[in-house]
Amino acid sequence: MRTLEDSSGTVLHRLIQEQLRYGNLTETRTLLAIQQQALRGGAGAGGTGSPQASLEIGAPEDSQVLQQATRQEPQGQEHQGGETHLAENRLYRLCPQPSKGEELPTYEEAKAHSQYYAAQQAGSRLHGGDRDPRGASGGSRRQDEALRELRHGHVRSLSERLLQLSLERNGARVPSHMSSSHSFPQLARSQQGPQPRGPPAEGPEPRGPPPQYPHAVMAQETAAVNDPRYRPRSSPHFQHAEVRILQAQVPPVFLQQQQYQYLQQPQEHSPPLHPAALGHGPPSSFSPPALEGPPGAQATSGSAHLAQMESVLRENARLQRDNERLQRELESTSEKASCIEKLENEIQRLSEAHESLMRTSSKREALEKTMRNKMDSEMRRLQDFNRDLRERLESANRHLASKTQEAQAGSQDMVAKLLAQSYEQQQEQEKLEREMALLRGAIEDQRRRAELLEQALGNAQSRAARAEEELRKKQAYVEKVERLQQALGQLQAACEKREQLELRLRTRLEQELKALRAQQRQTGTLTGGGGSHTGSTELSALRLSEQLREKEEQILALEADMTKWEQKYLEERAMRQFAMDAAATAAAQRDTTLIRHSPQPSPSSSFNEGLLAGNHRHQEMESRLKVLHAQILEKDAVIKVLQQRSRKDPGKATQGTLRPAKSVPSIFAAAVGTQGWQGFSTSERQTDAPARQTVDRGPAEEPPATPPLPAHTKHGSRDGSTQTDGPADSTSACLASEPDSLLGCNGSQRTTSLDSIAATRVQDLSDMVEILI
């Protein structure tokens, strides 16, 4: 019973510890009252009292201080993990890890605990009614009932057997250290090692184990190990909804009972869980011990596994702290690097601006220095000249004074002359001053002109750069034109190959037609020779007529395709002519605007002459580019026509339905007669005239037995894009009745009619090939 009391006391101690850490005062008092009742009940049932219970009851404040001191603070993994990690570790934090000296139970013990409490929970659900989980008296009553029921059954014999096995496995081990908390004897007992589990002091009906109970336990254990559907609760994949309900709704006073139900529900409906399901906490915090497994290696492996899990969790927390620290350092270094980069860019910009200012100031200083030197030289020259004038004036005055002294008579004349000379000198001096002012104005004009020349030089350089850029663009256009010319040559070669294939097909069809004519002649001779083979000859004649009809349908389909190509060619030619005219008008307008708005160069300066030559070259380049652009437009139109021809489906030539006959030269004549198409030359009309005459002569040369083939004409619409068929129904009817009428004629008439039809169609095909080329 000491073991049962230790387990229940340990659970209550841990709940009180959690409540003292996170709960309020009323719930803490309720838990302390429950612990006192449990200790009193355990002391009365076992016959022996705990000497430390009074200390524990009398001094709850000291125990609270010691519990808060001995509780290990979280290392940061609760705050560093995500929501999934917090959801996984909430049950683990509610049932804390044992202290360093506490011995962990084995897997067999934990399994026996869970099985026994599952059975007890099922019995309490069947026999008990609805209980209020929030009452303190109800919780203490439930715990007393659980302690009372543990004294019954076959737990006594099993506990004795497990005690013997544990003593044999561990030997006579002396408790080496005591707990640091003297107010809670449960912690001291758990750190001293496993207590000897004797039989309960009192309990009604002590009986032995049921037969074959260990075998059933081993079978359930093997089923739980081999079943892959159940995973440990420590894995991130095993998350049950009841854990969140327990954390959110159930108060921490009775969190222990809800944990019991959470661990018992999977055992009521399914095989036992994996051994790692109880890895996050000691099994004694969930249920009292009932069974222990006989092998000793599993205990060491379980403790090693738990120690490894603890080390992994500590390492994970340390790595997460290091990761956050490194992330903060990385953010700070990145901010510093960005600031340094901004400072470097600003310094570089300032240095460049300073260099440009230094260059401009040096130029300005050099210019000012030259002008100042010129002005100083001019002023020195004028000062020398003024000094000379003064010296001359002084000499004249001295000479005048000497003359007055020598001769008083002629002094007045000399004074007048000297006055006149002085007046002239004054005028000359004023003139020199005016010239100096003019020179100063000229200096200012030269300075302004130099600035204007610098601006013109910058503009000319910018225009030259733009001209070079346009030249590069136009060179790229020229390269594109060359590539398009190459593609055009390739398309022309492909079209020639296709025309050769069509010509071969035409010749093969003509050969087949000749063979059919020979067969018809043979059948005609056979029908004229004897009457015994009339049935077979009629069948062969019908078969030959069907073959001839099929060949005629193929020929008519080819003719229809050729007329369609002719119509597309005419449309593309008209569009190309329109595009070329538009491009020519646009180029002419650009030329006129450029010539009109071109700057008029002044022939007085060499700089303007250079600008004139550059503008002339630029205009020549633009005219050349306009010519190339017109050529590109023309070749683009030709390429579009060839691309439409290449996209033509070749399978349309072998259509099985009978299509109306369309005479190619008649269409061509109608197109020439229409005012919408003005692009044909007189040579094409002359080459087309014999073909129309042969077509017109073809039906006239046939015998009266064969119905004439009416000319099929097309009426062009106003925009030239649509055409309407004339007597298409009559033409199709005539073509449908043509093989029958040919069969009804004799051999010579049939041969002449087929030859004339073949000749006219070959001529039409040759004309169309020439037109397309």
UniProtKB/Swiss-Prot annotation:
Ranges of compositional bias, category Basic and acidic residues: 80-91, 100-112, 141-152
Crosslinked residue numbers (Glycyl lysine isopeptide (Lys-Gly) (interchain with G-Cter in ubiquitin)): K342, K403
Origin superkingdom: Eukaryota
GO cellular component: apical plasma membrane; bicellular tight junction; cell junction; cell projection; cytoplasm; cytoplasmic vesicle; plasma membrane; podosome
Main location: other
Region of interest (Required for interaction with CDH5), ranges: 101-302
Residues that bear Phosphotyrosine: Y107
Function text: Regulates the translocation of phosphorylated SRC to peripheral cell-matrix adhesion sites. Required for proper architecture of actin filaments. Plays a role in coupling actin fibers to cell junctions in endothelial cells and is therefore required for correct endothelial cell morphology via facilitating transcellular transmission of mechanical force resulting in endothelial cell elongation. Required for the anchoring of radial actin fibers to CDH1 junction complexes at the cell membrane which facilitates organization of radial actin fiber structure and cellular response to contractile forces.
Name listed for the protein in its UniProt record: Angiomotin-like protein 2
Primary gene name: Amotl2
